Amino acid sequence: FKVNIGFKNYIKFLSNESIRMPFLQIFVWTVCFSAITVFGTLAIGLVLACLVQWEFLRFRGVYRVFLILPYAVPSFISILVFKGLFNQNFGELNMFLNTIMGPIYGAFGLEWSSIEWFTSPWPARAMILMVNAWLGYPYMMILCMGLLKSIPDDLYEATAIEGATPWINLRHITLPLLIKPLAPLLIASFAFNFNNFVLIQLLTGGGPDIIEATQAPAGYTDLLVSF
């Protein structure tokens, strides 16, 4: 037999708030997550690439190895390690924060409570972004290191004669010459993170749950691919 659905599913989606609102929340979060990850890892990678290629820095090769090392570790292992570090009850990160922040809050007559990384929406999203930044910055750093090598030193020497500061060099020489070759890779990175199912599934499973989503179970850290 044949059932004619037509536009019924679209009508149901648009008219049912318990389905529409979680979907819109997840869509906005997915776009923000992808964009923040791309530009965040690019910024971290560029800064680190500039530092490890600074001619006055000693042991640059050693620093390069240690900074690229996270890229050699399988992502699912790193995610599971971070899941333990962020554990709300016995994770090392909360223990460290409790040790540091507890006395500071106590000095003002306040009580410090452990951060609920897995049960509160915004801490969970912040955790997702931090873990993804750790996973993504080595890739961006490697790209920036290669592209920085391709920029002629004559340009920097000419601006040095004019008295240009490092900030001016970054704005008018480094970034313009980096963005064009990086653009396709940034778009590819955005698309990858837009569908980053493994990170969400292993770290939070999409949680914490959106209470309003009664007919379509959804979580605050869900991406469209895991919704």
List PLM regions with ranges.
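A structural signal for multi-pass alpha-helical bundles of membrane permease subunits
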Residues: 1-227
